[in-house]
Swiss-Prot record:
InterPro entries (alphabetical): Kinase-like_dom_sf, Prot_kinase_dom, Protein_kinase_ATP_BS
Active site (UniProt): 251 (proton acceptor)
Organism, scientific name: Caenorhabditis elegans
Name of this protein: Putative serine/threonine-protein kinase C01C4.3
Residues bound to ATP: 132-140, 155
Compositional bias (Polar residues): 33-57
GO terms for cellular component: cytoplasm
Recorded catalytic activity of this chain's protein: L-seryl-[protein] + ATP = O-phospho-L-seryl-[protein] + ADP + H(+); L-threonyl-[protein] + ATP = O-phospho-L-threonyl-[protein] + ADP + H(+)
Residue span(s) of domain Protein kinase: 126-397
EC number(s) on file: 2.7.11.1
Top EC class for this record: transferase
Keywords (A to Z) from UniProt: ATP-binding, Kinase, Nucleotide-binding, Serine/threonine-protein kinase, Transferase
């Protein structure tokens, strides 16, 4: 320990209080007062950021802990008539989305703690119907609220296979990110079933289909340039919002992009934040390789430690872009053992002048997007903002010359 540090520590415990000690004492007093009294602020006072009491355990973005003037969650002018679970009783767009909620993130006091999770008898509150989908960590079922007759989606996490900390993390990321118009709405409240078999939380129901189902319905023809631009305008807006909060989705794929109107693709939302982590977080790699994984992930061994980086989302977006346009994937795995990917990498490195045939229909601007998203050098990849600018006005496919008949 340096002499200056020794002197500072001595002053903190033996001598007069230093500036650092007074600041720490003040912050502790603020936290204690909040936990003991919970006094509501005057409605005329402006919102102030509160101390991050749960940052080390939950690791949330800073803006996720902003509060409104009454220390309650701003909930988009929703009416909460349900007895146990706060789900909106009205379904109009004006009531479901408010300007205040979409422009800011707020949180109700205590919702980021590891308090005991409330038990709820699902049969008393909901009529649970068919299963909508399943994933690595849980499954989703369609349900109808008995009082309001509103359809919602319930995401279940089997308790034997789920740690409470993992469930709380996913709920909080889902809840805090849902103010964005292109991210699935998650309603307030973490619960567990009365028989202790599962944790669950409630989200809005998508009546149409996922992007995967929409593309498969085209019989490998793709959804077209116009619809692809609409989808990516929404998805890139959501991912750019997450990246601005230093959060990485880490599981972007067509199944996790929901299409609420399959006719014009006017309403698109991103879902599933089970693997979401903060930038620079260290995680263990799991044996789970899919078409969307970046090259650096495909060469990783099981349980190897990785540092979370935004560039993995950018790679996945490049794959999704190709999938929307062509109706199929460019390759099965981003490894040199996979010939289609090896050909792409050889062209990127200029070792082969011939562009892979799969990419021939794309324009120069679209090829630039691929080069800046599907490059094995993750530091050279674009940001979500760069991709959004490229897709805004540029043509994605080459112009096809129509032969003029000769008379």
């Amino acid at each position: 320990m340096t002499p200056e540090k020794t002197k500072e520590v001595f002053q903190m415990f033996k001598g007069a209080p230093t500036r650092r000690k007074s600041e720490n004492a003040h912050s502790h007093r603020v936290v204690l007062n909040q936990l003991q009294n919970h006094p509501p602020r005057n409605a005329t006072q402006s919102p102030q950021r509160q101390p991050r009491t749960s940052e080390s355990s939950m690791d949330f973005p800073r803006s996720a802990l902003r509060r409104n003037s009454t220390d309650t969650h701003v909930f988009a002018n929703r009416t909460h008539n349900h007895r146990d679970i706060n789900v909106p009783a009205c379904s109009s767009e004006e009531d479901r989305v408010s300007t205040a909620r979409r422009n800011s993130l707020f949180v109700k006091r205590g919702s980021v703690t590891m308090e005991p999770i409330k038990k709820v008898d699902l049969e008393e509150v909901y009529t649970v119907n068919k299963q909508l989908g399943t994933g690595r960590f849980g499954f989703i079922k369609l349900a109808e609220h008995k009082q309001s007759k509103q359809r919602i989606a319930i995401k279940f996490f089997p308790r034997p296979q789920t740690k409470q900390a993992d469930f709380v993390r996913e709920y909080n990321y889902s809840f805090f990110l849902s103010p964005h118009q292109n991210i699935i709405d998650t309603y307030e409240g973490m619960f567990q079933s009365s028989d202790d078999t599962a944790y669950f939380f409630v989200q809005e129901f998508c009546p149409r289909a996922s992007l995967r189902e929409a593309v498969e319905a085209t019989n490998q023809a793709g959804i077209g340039e116009a619809n692809t631009k609409k989808v990516f305008a929404a998805v890139l807006s959501a991912i750019e919002f997450m990246h601005d909060e230093n959060l990485v989705h880490r599981n972007l794929k067509a199944e996790n992009i929901l299409i609420f109107d399959a006719n014009d693709y006017s309403k698109v939302k991103v879902t599933d934040f089970g693997l979401t982590r903060k930038v620079d977080t260290t995680v263990k790699y799991l044996e789970y390789v899919n078409n969307y994984h970046a090259a650096e992930l495909c060469d990783t061994v099981v349980n190897e430690k990785l540092v979370v980086n935004k560039s993995t989302d950018i790679w996945a977006l490049g794959i999704i872009f190709f999938y929307c346009m062509k109706g199929k994937f460019p390759w099965q795995k981003a490894s040199i053992m996979c010939k289609p990917y090896w050909e792409w990498e050889q062209w990127l490195k200029r070792k082969n002048p011939a562009l892979p045939k799969k990419f021939n229909p794309f324009s120069e601007k679209a090829l630039k997007l691929f080069k800046k998203s599907l490059t094995p050098r993750f530091k050279d990849r674009w940001t979500a903002k760069d991709m959004r600018k490229c897709l805004a006005k540029e043509k994605l496919l080459k112009s096809v010359k129509v032969a003029v008949p000769y008379y």
